[in-house]
Amino acid sequence: MADETKATDAGQRYAQSLFELTIENNQLTKVEADLKSLRAMVAASTDLRRLLESPAFSAEDKAKGLTAVAAKAGFQLLTAKFLGLVASNGRAGDLMGAITAFVEMSAQHRGVVTAEVVTASALTAAQLKGVSTAVASALGKTPEISTRVDPSILGGIKVRVGSRLFDASLRSKLDSLKFALKRA
């Protein structure tokens, strides 16, 4: 399965347009909060994920659904219009990537780097603080960290900052060992 949080070219363009509008209208933090909230809703709801991903729903149905979600959640008007536009243009599948791109643009605008941390089990507050400190010292910037649990990595940690991936997972170490043994 493709990584739906990776920004496509279309998602990047939508994110850039929204970013410019939020700067012009002085709504950057509010719209960013809305989009982060929507991202959490999509992660938590299989029905919402299905609405975005399934070709069985028309662009019009997706637009109506996203607009209803935005209204129910109390999103900014700009956010609601953006969601409706993306869906009605048949780009609902690019929405999560657009959100990721927007959040990265916003963080860059604030002078903060975004880092996605993937672990096999949830991190404690102390562990998260340690990761944050390590990322900050490595990059020289304050990190904004989002965490995700992926049991398939077996153990260790993966940290993605922009296009760079620091992979210290047990899965990758085992894969490397397997490859080395096959070559021997």
Curated annotation (Swiss-Prot):
Entries under InterPro entries matching the protein: ATP_synth_OSCP/delta_N_sf (IPR026015), ATPase_OSCP/dsu (IPR000711)
Signal peptide region: none
Per the record, the major location class is: membrane
How is this protein situated with respect to the membrane? Peripheral membrane protein
Q: Is Membrane found in the keyword set? A: yes
Its assembly, as annotated, is:
F-type ATPases have 2 components, F(1) - the catalytic core - and F(0) - the membrane proton channel. F(1) has five subunits: alpha(3), beta(3), gamma(1), delta(1), epsilon(1). F(0) has three main subunits: a(1), b(2) and c(10-14). The alpha and beta chains form an alternating ring which encloses part of the gamma chain. F(1) is attached to F(0) by a central stalk formed by the gamma and epsilon chains, while a peripheral stalk is formed by the delta and b chains.
Q: Which family does it belong to?
A: Belongs to the ATPase delta chain family.
The name of this protein is ATP synthase subunit delta
Record organism: Caulobacter sp. (strain K31)
Task: Tell me the name of the encoding gene.
Answer: atpH
